[in-house]
Amino acid sequence: MKPTKAGIRKRLAATAAVLSVSAALLVSAPGTGSAATTATPSLRAFGLTGDGTLMATFTTDRPNVLDWVRAVTGLSGDTRLLAIDHRVQNGLMYGLGEKGGLYTIKTPPQTTDVVVTKVSQLQVPLYGTNFGFDFNPAADRLRIVSDNGQNLRHNLNDHTTVEDTTLTTPPLTGPARGVTASGYTNNDLVAATGTVLYGIDTTTDNLVLQAPANNGTLSTVGSLGFDAQPNAGLDLFSQLTNGKTTSVVGFASLTPYGASTPTLYSINLFTGEPTAIDRFPLNITSLAITLTGS
């Protein structure tokens, strides 16, 4: 069903209400240009290297310290992973292969190495170099976007892939070529909270909203404030109370031009302003924060 404008406004309003709590806790008021003194939350996260062959784990307050680094094993029909994310419906971590394979991921201490198992295959070929990859928690669908404007929606339950409308940034016409990271808000199973899709456009160096997601319509939230290299990562962590999202925190892996490795940033979801936390010791370009933070 195509979402109505009223429905979209309702979801955006709900997200704004949740984000206002996050802003009070973690960032300064929009327009002040300074970060609050509140410490970065220590959340367990996983990262994928830019070549898609290694995974690591770290906490969001110390991205400079990798607790382990392991090779990705078990790929079938793919040679590397492009991106990773957690699925709210079952708590599992998934990865996307460069040929469109979709995998569940097991990590230490459950296994010695990072072991992936193929569970599905995109029915539409990937088109692009760098990709955003995130689960819609409300619809239980995978959203995959690319720096060529590709906009896919995949159902892991019946293995179907829908090719949604190409990404655009009105009033400009033609594909929006630059969105290389994506993240949905409100990772819970409460229908009333809804969800909104954010993205990072490394061509315009902006944080953007994709709404409606199926229509591929992009609007600018705010500037990152520097020139970022194309391969980026974005993930949004939802703090839950009684199973419902009460705050949302954004994190991004971004590599300023001239830097040798990415830096982990917290992202102000109202303004797009990034605040550097620390630099990764490896080329970590895709992020997946655990659903519980531990």
Please place each PLM-identified region on the residue numbering.
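Repeated scaffold domains used in trafficking and secretory/extracellular systems
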Residues: 76-89, 121-138, 169-187, 227-239, ...
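Structural motif
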Residues: 52-58, 101-106, 113, 148-155, ...
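Secretory targeting and sorting signals
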Residues: 1-35
